[in-house]
Amino acid sequence: MESADILPGSRGTVDRRCEGSEEKITPPRPVEDFNPQLFPNEVYLNFTSMHGIQPVVARIRELSRKTVSAAMVPPLEWFERLPRLETPLDIEPLHLPFSVYLISGNAGSGKSTCIQTLNETMDCVITGATRVAAQNVYTKLSSAFATRHINTIFQEFGFRGNHVQAQLGKYQYSCSSSPPPIEELQKRDIVYYWEVLVDITRRLFESTASRGEFENIRALERLLGRAPGSLTRLAFCTNGSLPAFTRTNIVIIDEAGLLGRHLLTVVVYCWWMLNAAYKSPQYAEGKVPVIVCVGSPTQTDSLESRFEHKNLKCHVRSSENVLTHIITNRTIREYVSLSTNWAIFINNKRCQEYEFGELMKVLEYGLPITEEHMRLVDTFVVPEAYINNPANLPGWTRLYSSHKEVSAYMAKLHAHLKVSGERQFVVFTLPAYTFVKTAAFDEYKKITQQPSLSLDKWLAANASRVSNYSQSRDQDAGKTQCEYYSEHGVVVARTDVTYVLNSQVSVTTRMRKFVFGFSGTFETFDAVLKDDAFIKTQGETSVEYAYRFLSTLLFSGMINFYNFLKRPGLDEGRVREAYRRMAALTAKLIPGASVLESACDNPSGAPLNFRGLTDPPGFTGGTTNDWDDDNDVVFAALNEGAIDMLYCNYEFVRPETTQEVYSQFLMLKTMFVGRYSIFMDLFGGDFESSPFDTFVDNISYKGCEIFVGSMRGGVSSIALQTDSYTLMGYTSAPVYPFVEELARRKLHEGIAELFGAMNMPRMVLRDQHGFMSVLNVNLSEFVESVDDVELDMATAVDYGLSSKLAMTIARSQGLSLDKVAICFPRNNLRINSVYVAMSRTVSSRFLRMNLNPLRERHERDTVISEHILAALRDRDVQIVY
């Protein structure tokens, strides 16, 4: 490796990037002398991509040190006055200082790797624009190191569930000059987002909770005679509920192109307000927030929806996104010095085929489309009927432009499976429920002046709003049936939803699951044990629980080795040798099993005296009543080596202390690895690909339903939207952690009673590693906002699953898909949507589409493309290849 002191020079010098740095840059030294400024000792960097990323890290670190004078710091009193204003138009314009660093690039170019490096090199708040974006970042970060949960930017600045239905843009502010100064733009955004911001502000200052954590730390420093700021970090150790914005001034937002332009000011406003309210050290120092926006302005749209209650219609419109706003708005661009604070990542690393990569660049940057590009896309085109026929392209993911098209394809797929005689992919139906409170519904009709509004009509119009995810409209759902429970004041709407057994699915939100077994092969289970994958992904609450669970699976699954030896066609000599070696291994690890080893070495082949195993030392006689003759015959008929003496000599208990838990796991893991090595030596590949199933208790199947004796011994975990699952069926077995979680929910009394009596089944999933889990039901509460009145209208309960067999193009954003078939619309075709859909594939060999969008009439955002092309020619912009 080259000297750590040599920074990769890329359109700018090290001196310019680090100008104003508080740390001293030492002159070049020998290779073995480590430079702590460039490479801190506690950090492991990805050296293959560090060449271009290091200047990005240096520049963001430099921006984070920027401070403003005390006169420029927004005063606490300004925030406290806002909730008392009659209208947001009366807000006194105030400059809220901030910095921006923009990281853009085409799909799969390494933007997430850059976020990972920033996370490892500096203290920052990492967020996503959506839950999927946040969990994608979490997956990337946790693959290298243990990391805290990643929230959305909305969760970090205080957005709550009741804000979803807030009416944005109710007030409008027009700037008085052109181009407007920065404080005018900020007032415009605050006024636009007023309904949400005023509620967040009011809730903060009306809260009775103490906000004196940092004051207490400063008092402790004075008491101990310590230097000011020396104990500041203790505040986050002793007060876990402190807002993340008070910890650091670096805020990273992934997929920022999905956010409206006003969200930039909203984040800056909330950062200053929280730091002022908590009197944080960075507020006292006058530090300025650095908003690192990651994404692509040409890929994504910012969408805003507004529900019209009178006509029961939801209007969705595109709005200018944050990235486009930063790049194209003259005031913002000059204020943040965009040229020196912009990194563009080039080259698609997801699909590394040269011609296809060049095509993606053309679509991304608005370059001229040639006949050669069109001919390349022609090779992907097949008839639309071919894509929409479920019998074709099995296992491919269909992408559509609308939820209606997705739902229609799913219905067609299910109808095909019902008549195809397919045994692996079986169709089954389960009920989903919506509980509507009659009192709230009557109040809604009164406020909206719709006395004749029927519940069926309201449910049909609000189906996508009642659930907490838009993919609910993708499902193949039957007709809704309503039943009125007058004593409970609730109407229960039931809808039957169709699912496909053994199909690929994902969860629609962050949900609780209970892992109770493993279903895979000997090879996959051995891989899980060797790389500690389960400990890293499931042991988030307590490592002891994860080790205890694995010990249970190991103990229950050891019998699979003996079951393998009963397969017909195996060489008898190798089978006898396997029995002998396993007996020796068991005797070595469990001293009480030594009797087996001596029996296996008995050349006479005489039956093992099973009665003698239970006799005390020196016992020579006794009554025959102790042993049943039939049992004696059964045991004596078995070859002595065919019995796994692990189960005869080892009492499986649930240890309490950490040392005992790990000792038990280590012994059982050693036994599994030893047996695995024996069988690989004797049977090779035939063995490692054989089934290995193990559970905490006995299970049985009846059609698509799974029966489990007991869930005791399983472990609670979290299912993320970025995980890939196979739908294995459903179960009605009680899962006590789920029962306790439901009891903690503050549900309407009538709804809680009705739901508890339904015994709603739960889905059983297998993850990408092979672990089997029961998924809790997805329970979401719908609060309607009408004319400043909030109505707690309904509670929806479903299974929280979304099929990977078909989805909208918008939902596929950020995903890598193996095989993709796209149905583009023939009208309103947009190139950025085409780019998102085509760039999902990892290989163009597995890409099909119904038309060539380059030969069709389409819309293209040339304005933003021109700005990006200009940036590529700007020597101050950092280019990362």
Curated annotation (Swiss-Prot):
Keyword Transmembrane: no
Annotated segments matching region Disordered: 1-32
Primary location class: host cell
InterPro entries assigned to the protein according to its UniProt record, in alphabetical order: DNA_helicase_dom (IPR003840), HSV_HELI (IPR034711), P-loop_NTPase (IPR027417)
EC number: 3.6.4.-
GO biological process: DNA replication
Keywords: ATP-binding, DNA replication, Helicase, Host nucleus, Hydrolase, Nucleotide-binding
Enzyme class: hydrolase
Annotated Pfam families: Herpes_Helicase
Description of how the protein assembles with itself and partners: Associates with the primase and the primase-associated factor to form the helicase-primase complex.
Protein family membership: Belongs to the herpesviridae helicase family.
Protein name: DNA replication helicase
UniProt organism field: Equine herpesvirus 1 (strain Ab4p)
Encoding gene, per UniProt annotation: HELI
